[in-house]
Amino acid sequence: MEVCPKCKGGGWITVRKSTPRSKFVYGDDRELEYAEKCDYCNGGEKQIVQDIRERANIPATYYDASIENFKWDIYLDEKGNVVDTSGQRKFVESFLENFEKWQEKGIGFYIHSKTRGTGKTFLASCICNSLMTKYKITTKFVSASNLINLSKEDRPGEKNPIDVMCECKVLVLDDIGQKMTGEEWMNDLLFKIIESRYQNKLVTLFTANAKCDELRGIDDRVTSRINKISQNIPLPEYSYRLKESNDEKRDFYKEMGLM
């Protein structure tokens, strides 16, 4: 973790200034030394957030993304009109503004669309990063297809990855339902994680390429729990990723004088 260059990680700095206390104690405006919260790292909060982020495993592409980066008006219909996403946006904004209340109920989001590249993982990352910045809470981002590998990990001196997923304040299970067909024991593992989080009212975010009741290889007890602990957030069937990629290339071509 990078140490604040100003306070050296202490969170406080010493300043000299004249205050009414100088006049009261000494009868003049002499400067006295005071301890103040470091204005560079906001009293150590930057280090705290950075440390939390490093352990969260957010995809590198979205490491610094926040909800302000998510463009709700980028989605277009077949006629080129902007798709109304005000309902989805309202839920996400309420979640970030009133997280403590959502946390009390243990309710997260099930973000889905059939089309790839619509911004499901991006939105989940934006939400996670915003939560870490605002509330300083521990989060964990896990690709569902990597659960198999994580369940086999055993690192001496480190907490079991499955226990971490069961206990972190916010868990993201990304791309759930992929590469799981026929894996009954994987359903058992998923149910164990989700059931533990349900019992302890811990918030979970899911992303998927299908509606919950259409997930491939996921049995009813798992989907039932997912429905119980998450609010449905459908994203329009429009490739956010392709639009952004095309926009970036177009800007580059303009810069090169090719357009």
Task: List the model feature ranges, each with a label.
Residues 137-138, 167-170, 200-206:
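Loop/turn-to-beta-strand initiation segments
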Residues 1-90, 94, 237, 241-259:
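A short, basic N-terminal segment
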Residues 7, 70, 143, 174, ...:
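Conserved RecA-like P-loop NTPase ATPase core
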Residues 79-90, 109, 114-115, 128-168, ...:
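Short glycine-rich substrate-engagement loop in P-loop NTPases that contacts/grips substrate
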Residues 90-103, 107:
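Pre-Walker A adenine-sensing motif
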